[in-house]
């Protein structure tokens, strides 16, 4: 974008602005938003000061940020994102916005140069005093000394929470001399101490817990945007006591007990960890002299104000709404007089003393004495929307008037295509600027602004894809590392105390933890399991592969089995019979598919390439891979049967559209089958829009079509006139005949009834089939389905998708009003989820009173199908602002303009349901908001509380996401295998079911389990060999290490585990060293045919297999073991070699030496 800024800065009009920009009370009028951004960016580039840009709300700040990213390096652009909803302090929220706020405050506190965008709400927000913030920024360097206790206290003050293992943002842990920290900004870091000196600093991966790169120094930012120290708490307690005493006599007697409870709950501050999420609502009482963000700026900072009059309008509501919210919570006994989140000074007072430049599109009166007024003439650009003739004449006008024409397109490919198009129009154009740009020609560059603009006095016009082709600007993602790092998923198999488990031989029990037991004077670790009644089972950790976590549907609580009973055997037998039946069906399907002959498509045509280049967005890697897999299938003679699995809005439709186009280009017809009329309409419109420039006849068959139109479509399918038909189950009517059906696309097949599914089966015969689903299919299950259906998965979201900002808070009408107003003010729409049909119309009336100007509709499952569809269609077409609805919106509704979701009584929903509902919003380039409300003062059940806790972690990839994914995987398994199997999965748990199915399928196909080259080795030595709690306190980490040791088969793996232990837990004690020695002995034994190593008190007994006995080179062995002398004796038992080793000092070393010699004798024998 340097071309554009070069043209701007050389112009006299900009130079006039530049001279007075940054002087007190300057007004600049006439500039459109994108033109204004260009000027501000250039001013920033030419100055050495901090520049503060103030907007009226966060939505406007986001829009300006997107354009500014085209001119300013992301490292120098900062935003202070505060919701326009004052009550956000009362909610649990996603960490993304907080990490941006912390990044901004930290840069300001360090005096960094930058352009800072702050909405009015952020300008007024009470903050930690500047000096306190500066004192809590830490830079650690290798070789420095630290006071560990002081350092850990500081982390707590900064909002970090102490855990045994760090797995989430904002956590830290101490294990021996190792401190792990996961800051909100940057990589997780591991600090290793030598006494009090920092010996090393390393990045580490939270998923593997392994160190990555060494660094010399690291900045540790706070994990909260408030610093809370012991002194702050002490001051807070005094202020809170006064506020409580002032409030109590002034409220109704009936709520005084509630107020007392609120006061008492706030008094229970733990000194080890201050809950910043709760304390933030008491910010007005926390600091003697709180700051606002303006005090964080340098004294010579420049201020630019975007649309002063809009800011003053917003300021009015910012004063009224918090007042009414605070009044509400005080009246209900949930708040105190004096509680506030913002400074109530007016806007002008807040920015007093700084040079301010005001930007306004129109010249309006302002209550400010202005020193300079700069007027620009700026026009919007003609909207061409792909109309070639209009585009040519307008470009010709610019050339004739000697304009500098800047054309912005979003990819390199489009730069080339645009140049070719202008060349056809005989418009001179270039794509690179060598020295200076001549007027009367176009320069085409890669870039993007929210809109184009024309500055006639400068002779400059900027044209974007929005004007050229009606494309929306792609949201630029300014990423700090915090987001990319957010919550890596660990397996849902993590075992926690109290979890249900399945033991292969004993059935369903409950995991009670790892216990160290002394058996025969030897300490070992055992997994403790609880069964029915008082039955308990201790499983040695080396047999832990027999224990799996019980995974089933979210709402399924299993029944504990009785130890030693026949109940579990009967259950397994019943499931076994069922999986064998399914295996039989799968084998038949597999054979049928292998035999079938279908149409074999050729390579992509030139039209296909042109069509694909017309897609206005970059494909994600997963989309590209899925398209390649589908085309490969189509180019084979065997009919395709592929399942395309991807979250809602991840671009499955575009993949399907390309497959459809390929089929049509070879003269084949395509049927696109969808479960609802609304979806049919949406897919139909997408296809029409994507294929408008190509000779493809597309028709729709649904209730939105007249009988006459349906009849014509049927005729067109029969004669071959119609290429693509989109429709609901009407497509499955027996009276529909295709001339040459080549591809059937089925969206969400599981939503069709049994009769329709049978009809789909008959249609599938010898035709390529692509099935789309948003319900994830477990890979393990797919593997056991042996390719009856191929699977493609889209797991990465499109580039311009942002994590939905998620809030969990108590129900409150003034908050709901704010949330609704904020979404409607950005011309968006709202889903309001209320799951009680009997009172849903009363809820609508209640919301209508709150929002008298809003158009509110109702949708629920008891409406007639036609009424429901008409309502939904009206909502999609933007005829309603708010849709009060039940969970019927959970699947299959695409409303990109609806970006706020409010759910009442969220504690009553399952996590997977909440996950899918949340997927309704945030599906355009705007940030989506989801508000999960639960009733105030309601005593929640333990399950609901756990669920809300999980939802609180329900950010980009939190543990709530894992649980939702688990439940959805099981739902996906049920969809694939049928309802009855869903029940069997719940009986024995998902993992054991998958294992049994895979075994049954392999048996039917005659595939035997590959027999191990060597038998299982039993090593039984009377040694204390385990992981002591003093060394690894976290049980999950302990189990994880035991699992790795159990699977170890090579010496490289042993070295890797040793490195990991030292990396994560520091030097290991003697018990761990012995455990590693035993694993090393076992690896030697595995490679040399040893079947048993048993400690018999004074001797060690070693048994070899018959095969190993035949292969060993005895001469080599005896030579190698001479140092052992008479302590070693060799014998033969049942044609197999036995060796006894007499125990002496250092006998463990002797044993290691002996098994190594046996292995080498075996190797030499093999080589000979």
Swiss-Prot record:
<keyword id="KW-0547">Nucleotide-binding</keyword>
<dbReference type="InterPro" id="IPR037235">
    <property type="entry name" value="TRCF-like_C_D7"/>
</dbReference>
<comment type="similarity">
    <text>In the N-terminal section; belongs to the UvrB family.</text>
</comment>
<feature type="domain" description="Helicase C-terminal">
    <location>
        <begin position="808"/>
        <end position="969"/>
    </location>
</feature>
<dbReference type="GO" id="GO:0005524">
    <property type="term" value="F:ATP binding"/>
</dbReference>
<dbReference type="InterPro" id="IPR004576">
    <property type="entry name" value="Mfd"/>
</dbReference>
<feature type="domain" description="Helicase ATP-binding">
    <location>
        <begin position="633"/>
        <end position="794"/>
    </location>
</feature>
<keyword id="KW-0347">Helicase</keyword>
<dbReference type="Pfam" id="PF00271">
    <property type="entry name" value="Helicase_C"/>
</dbReference>
<dbReference type="InterPro" id="IPR014001">
    <property type="entry name" value="Helicase_ATP-bd"/>
</dbReference>
<dbReference type="GO" id="GO:0016787">
    <property type="term" value="F:hydrolase activity"/>
</dbReference>
<feature type="short sequence motif" description="DEEQ box">
    <location>
        <begin position="747"/>
        <end position="750"/>
    </location>
</feature>
<dbReference type="InterPro" id="IPR041471">
    <property type="entry name" value="UvrB_inter"/>
</dbReference>
<dbReference type="GO" id="GO:0006355">
    <property type="term" value="P:regulation of DNA-templated transcription"/>
</dbReference>
<dbReference type="InterPro" id="IPR001650">
    <property type="entry name" value="Helicase_C-like"/>
</dbReference>
<dbReference type="Pfam" id="PF00270">
    <property type="entry name" value="DEAD"/>
</dbReference>
<dbReference type="InterPro" id="IPR047112">
    <property type="entry name" value="RecG/Mfd"/>
</dbReference>
<comment type="similarity">
    <text>In the C-terminal section; belongs to the helicase family. RecG subfamily.</text>
</comment>
<dbReference type="InterPro" id="IPR036101">
    <property type="entry name" value="CarD-like/TRCF_RID_sf"/>
</dbReference>
<feature type="binding site">
    <location>
        <begin position="646"/>
        <end position="653"/>
    </location>
    <ligand>
        <name>ATP</name>
    </ligand>
</feature>
<dbReference type="InterPro" id="IPR003711">
    <property type="entry name" value="CarD-like/TRCF_RID"/>
</dbReference>
<dbReference type="Pfam" id="PF02559">
    <property type="entry name" value="CarD_TRCF_RID"/>
</dbReference>
<keyword id="KW-0067">ATP-binding</keyword>
<keyword id="KW-0234">DNA repair</keyword>
<keyword id="KW-0378">Hydrolase</keyword>
<dbReference type="InterPro" id="IPR027417">
    <property type="entry name" value="P-loop_NTPase"/>
</dbReference>
<dbReference type="InterPro" id="IPR005118">
    <property type="entry name" value="TRCF_C"/>
</dbReference>
<dbReference type="GO" id="GO:0003678">
    <property type="term" value="F:DNA helicase activity"/>
</dbReference>
<dbReference type="Pfam" id="PF21132">
    <property type="entry name" value="MFD_D3"/>
</dbReference>
<dbReference type="GO" id="GO:0000716">
    <property type="term" value="P:transcription-coupled nucleotide-excision repair, DNA damage recognition"/>
</dbReference>
<dbReference type="Pfam" id="PF17757">
    <property type="entry name" value="UvrB_inter"/>
</dbReference>
<dbReference type="Pfam" id="PF03461">
    <property type="entry name" value="TRCF"/>
</dbReference>
<keyword id="KW-0227">DNA damage</keyword>
<dbReference type="GO" id="GO:0005737">
    <property type="term" value="C:cytoplasm"/>
</dbReference>
<dbReference type="InterPro" id="IPR048635">
    <property type="entry name" value="MFD_D3"/>
</dbReference>
<keyword id="KW-0963">Cytoplasm</keyword>
<dbReference type="InterPro" id="IPR011545">
    <property type="entry name" value="DEAD/DEAH_box_helicase_dom"/>
</dbReference>
<keyword id="KW-0238">DNA-binding</keyword>
<dbReference type="GO" id="GO:0003684">
    <property type="term" value="F:damaged DNA binding"/>
</dbReference>
<protein>
    <recommendedName>
        <fullName>Transcription-repair-coupling factor</fullName>
        <ecNumber>3.6.4.-</ecNumber>
    </recommendedName>
</protein>
<comment type="function">
    <text>Couples transcription and DNA repair by recognizing RNA polymerase (RNAP) stalled at DNA lesions. Mediates ATP-dependent release of RNAP and its truncated transcript from the DNA, and recruitment of nucleotide excision repair machinery to the damaged site.</text>
</comment>
